Amino acid sequence: MKAIIVLLMVVTSNADRICTGITSSNSPHVVKTATQGEVNVTGVIPLTTTPTKSHFANLKGTKTRGKLCPKCLNCTDLDVALARPKCTGTIPSAKASILHEVKPVTFGCFPIMHDRTKIRQLPNLLRGYEHIRLSTHNVINAEKAPGGPYKIGTSGSCPNVTNGNGFFATMAWAVPKNDNNKTATNSLTVEVPYICTEGEDQITVWGFHSDNEIQMVKLYGDSKPQKFTSSANGVTTHYVSQIGGFPNQAEDGGLPQSGRIVVDYMVQKSGKTGTITYQRGILLPQKVWCASGRSKVIKGSLPLIGEADCLHEKYGGLNKSKPYYTGEHAKAIGNCPIWVKTPLKLANGTKYRPPAKLLKER
């Protein structure tokens, strides 16, 4: 009988050490469970982090595009997209791109009515492609287009590489060449062929010029509003020019301009022809953009400093230290943590249980 009593005493005195999953030590950790609500445990691993705002960076493992043309000095992305003189150069390929100009504008050249068309979207459209290049050839012969012959207009506000008068390389300002064809005209149509490599999208830039009545008669022989239409890939767009009412505006140190240009673009899929119907003041397409592949685009800011696992619209460049994050929820690209509303913890200890009270000896 004594042997049995001794055995029971051993088992009782060691109970808190041999039962797995239970501890009697104090525990500061509380986790929420699906079945038992809040539970005290002996240890947890935090699964979430709350990022702090940082600068944007290059995405690890891929090329990241900031400016469309990094080597085009004193040029906005819209200058590059329209091929303003001194703003042409190689656009590096990239799998990820930073949208850093919310409302792109041109830095100089001829005054543009930016908000009459979707032209502000052009830089960001180009940014969404992995590979972008400007064609080496003009898409049409502007001098011999319907309604010609034309001379190609230039502006002193668009100095070229030799500091002579120039214009955007994507368009030709078609001005009637002589008095014989400097008259009002019915609508004319020109076909815009596909000249890119098969499989590429062709982005064709075009537009029109308008001025006050005196200048319209002087340049085109017609002071009435002119009509313009573009059509490509099932999308048709119509415009009517505005005559006069523009204050003189100087661009990039050039002479004050009483006229304005409206610029638009159309996307031609592989092998597809586009059309432009026009009257006087047409800016005929010339060099076109050939683009392929896809680049992930995210809103951000420049310069890009260093590298990061993830690019987040609100926090900039993030390195993934935890699988989840709390804070502001926004678009992110790369190897990013997942947004959660509240912090998550992984219990890696045991369930806490207060120590058993010893029975008093009788």
From Swiss-Prot:
Protein function: Binds to sialic acid-containing receptors on the cell surface, bringing about the attachment of the virus particle to the cell. Plays a major role in the determination of host range restriction and virulence. Class I viral fusion protein. Responsible for penetration of the virus into the cell cytoplasm by mediating the fusion of the membrane of the endocytosed virus particle with the endosomal membrane. Low pH in endosomes induce an irreversible conformational change in HA2, releasing the fusion hydrophobic peptide. Several trimers are required to form a competent fusion pore.
Keywords assigned by UniProt, alphabetized: Disulfide bond, Fusion of virus membrane with host endosomal membrane, Fusion of virus membrane with host membrane, Glycoprotein, Hemagglutinin, Host cell membrane, Host membrane, Host-virus interaction, Lipoprotein, Membrane, Palmitate, Signal, Transmembrane, Viral attachment to host cell, Viral envelope protein, Viral penetration into host cytoplasm, Virion, Virus entry into host cell
Glycosylation-annotated residues: 40, 74, 160, 181, 319, 348
Similarity-based family: Belongs to the influenza viruses hemagglutinin family.
Leftover remarks: Major glycoprotein, comprises over 80% of the envelope proteins present in virus particle.
InterPro entries per the UniProt record, alphabetical: Capsid_hemagglutn, Hemagglutn_HA1_a/b_dom_sf, Hemagglutn_influenz_A/B
Any one GO cellular component localisation term in the record: viral envelope
Signal sequence residues: 1-15
Modification after translation, per record: In natural infection, inactive HA is matured into HA1 and HA2 outside the cell by one or more trypsin-like, arginine-specific endoprotease secreted by the bronchial epithelial cells. One identified protease that may be involved in this process is secreted in lungs by club cells.
Protein's cellular compartments: Virion membrane; Host apical cell membrane
Keyword Transmembrane: yes
Gene3D superfamilies documented for this protein: 3.90.209.20, Hemagglutinin Chain A, Domain 2
Database matches in SUPFAM superfamilies: Viral protein domain (SSF49818)
Gene Ontology biological process terms, A to Z: fusion of virus membrane with host endosome membrane; fusion of virus membrane with host plasma membrane; symbiont entry into host cell; virion attachment to host cell
Identification of the protein by name: Hemagglutinin
